């Protein structure tokens, strides 16, 4: 799992991509409107003009995606240590987490030693079993 700052950076990158995709969609699919009554109707033979209702629905979806990403970013920002958390408190928390990590690492090392001991014991039992079968076949 990544840390909160990395998650925040990823979300900001995703939001930037969403903005670009939305602007690209608008640019490629918008209808043409006259600015004044006397102005001729503009058109672009390369543009794909989407029906107004479909265009509006797609814009609503894209806007909703951007809003959801904004909420996700705000939630990540809120989870970061705030201005109210002093440097000493942050250092104490880091020390506590480091001690906890050392304890967990010690437990892991003990578990690995126990596993290796059990594996040697199982290997010994298997060898004794195989030797017993081999000896019983020799005697018959």
UniProtKB/Swiss-Prot annotation:
<keyword id="KW-0804">Transcription</keyword>
<dbReference type="GO" id="GO:0003713">
    <property type="term" value="F:transcription coactivator activity"/>
</dbReference>
<dbReference type="InterPro" id="IPR021384">
    <property type="entry name" value="Mediator_Med21"/>
</dbReference>
<dbReference type="GO" id="GO:0003712">
    <property type="term" value="F:transcription coregulator activity"/>
</dbReference>
<dbReference type="GO" id="GO:0016592">
    <property type="term" value="C:mediator complex"/>
</dbReference>
<comment type="similarity">
    <text>Belongs to the Mediator complex subunit 21 family.</text>
</comment>
<dbReference type="GO" id="GO:0060261">
    <property type="term" value="P:positive regulation of transcription initiation by RNA polymerase II"/>
</dbReference>
<feature type="coiled-coil region">
    <location>
        <begin position="85"/>
        <end position="125"/>
    </location>
</feature>
<dbReference type="GO" id="GO:0006357">
    <property type="term" value="P:regulation of transcription by RNA polymerase II"/>
</dbReference>
<dbReference type="GO" id="GO:0070847">
    <property type="term" value="C:core mediator complex"/>
</dbReference>
<dbReference type="Pfam" id="PF11221">
    <property type="entry name" value="Med21"/>
</dbReference>
<keyword id="KW-0539">Nucleus</keyword>
<dbReference type="GO" id="GO:0005634">
    <property type="term" value="C:nucleus"/>
</dbReference>
<comment type="subunit">
    <text>Component of the Mediator complex, which is composed of at least 21 subunits that form three structurally distinct submodules. The Mediator head module contains MED6, MED8, MED11, SRB4/MED17, SRB5/MED18, ROX3/MED19, SRB2/MED20 and SRB6/MED22, the middle module contains MED1, MED4, NUT1/MED5, MED7, CSE2/MED9, NUT2/MED10, SRB7/MED21 and SOH1/MED31, and the tail module contains MED2, PGD1/MED3, RGR1/MED14, GAL11/MED15 and SIN4/MED16. The head and the middle modules interact directly with RNA polymerase II, whereas the elongated tail module interacts with gene-specific regulatory proteins.</text>
</comment>
<dbReference type="GO" id="GO:0000122">
    <property type="term" value="P:negative regulation of transcription by RNA polymerase II"/>
</dbReference>
<keyword id="KW-0010">Activator</keyword>
<protein>
    <recommendedName>
        <fullName>Mediator of RNA polymerase II transcription subunit 21</fullName>
    </recommendedName>
</protein>
<keyword id="KW-0805">Transcription regulation</keyword>
<dbReference type="GO" id="GO:0045944">
    <property type="term" value="P:positive regulation of transcription by RNA polymerase II"/>
</dbReference>
<dbReference type="GO" id="GO:0032968">
    <property type="term" value="P:positive regulation of transcription elongation by RNA polymerase II"/>
</dbReference>
<dbReference type="GO" id="GO:0003714">
    <property type="term" value="F:transcription corepressor activity"/>
</dbReference>
<keyword id="KW-0175">Coiled coil</keyword>
<dbReference type="GO" id="GO:0061629">
    <property type="term" value="F:RNA polymerase II-specific DNA-binding transcription factor binding"/>
</dbReference>
<comment type="function">
    <text>Component of the Mediator complex, a coactivator involved in the regulated transcription of nearly all RNA polymerase II-dependent genes. Mediator functions as a bridge to convey information from gene-specific regulatory proteins to the basal RNA polymerase II transcription machinery. The Mediator complex, having a compact conformation in its free form, is recruited to promoters by direct interactions with regulatory proteins and serves for the assembly of a functional preinitiation complex with RNA polymerase II and the general transcription factors.</text>
</comment>
<dbReference type="InterPro" id="IPR037212">
    <property type="entry name" value="Med7/Med21-like"/>
</dbReference>
<dbReference type="GO" id="GO:0051123">
    <property type="term" value="P:RNA polymerase II preinitiation complex assembly"/>
</dbReference>
């Amino acid at each position: 799992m990544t840390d909160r700052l990395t998650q925040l950076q990823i979300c900001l990158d995703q939001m930037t991509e969403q903005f670009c995709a939305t602007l690209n969609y608008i640019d490629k699919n918008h209808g043409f409107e006259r600015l004044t009554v006397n102005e001729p109707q503009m058109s672009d033979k390369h543009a794909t003009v989407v029906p107004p209702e479909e265009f509006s629905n797609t814009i609503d979806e894209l806007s909703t995606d951007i809003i959801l990403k904004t909420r996700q970013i705000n939630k990540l920002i809120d989870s970061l240590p705030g201005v109210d958390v002093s440097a000493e408190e942050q250092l104490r928390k880091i020390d506590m987490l480091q001690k906890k990590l050392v304890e967990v690492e010690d437990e892991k090392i003990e578990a690995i030693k126990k596993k290796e001991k059990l594996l040697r014991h199982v290997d010994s039992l298997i060898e004794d079993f195989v030797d017993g079968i081999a000896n019983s076949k020799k005697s018959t």
